[in-house]
A protein has these predicted regions:
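Glycine-aromatic micro-motifs
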Residues: 1-128
Length: 128
């Protein structure tokens, strides 16, 4: 299955090992209909779909076998859920979203202006 990764399993991030050698198809962007938040003090991103005011989120597209998918899911936080999302080229891929109501409840910061998790993490490691 085609799976969009936009967080801690990106190339160079700590959870990339959870992909179990999945085939990287390349950099990819979502359609401009999502928001990106830093969840649990920067532990992982949370994205959710919006009707307006969304951005294209930069990430990576992978081809996963059922075993690789199971390995990835085992490392995902329990609040996240898998859905089919739209990519910027009109195609679709599976991805993990985070419930908007939990983001709002906890006041997790909107980091959409960074355009992706890797840019956000690079900005936080450059500080202090």
């Amino acid at each position: 299955m085609r799976f969009f990764i936009c967080g801690s399993a990106l190339t160079g991030q700590p959870d990339n090992r959870n992909l179990g050698g999945a085939t990287l198809l390349g950099a990819a962007r979502t359609a401009p209909k999502y928001r990106l938040h830093s969840v649990k003090n920067g532990w992982h991103p949370g994205i959710y779909e919006v009707e307006s005011g969304g951005i294209s989120i930069l990430g990576e597209l992978y081809e996963l076998t059922p075993q690789q998918h199971a390995s990835l899911m085992a490392g995902e936080p329990p609040d996240m859920y898998q859905v089919t999302i739209e990519m910027d080229d009109g195609s679709h891929a599976e991805a993990m979203l985070y419930p908007r109501e939990l983001i709002e409840k906890h006041g997790y910061p909107d980091i959409s202006h960074f355009g992706g998790w890797a840019a956000y993490k690079a900005s936080t490691s450059a500080v202090g």
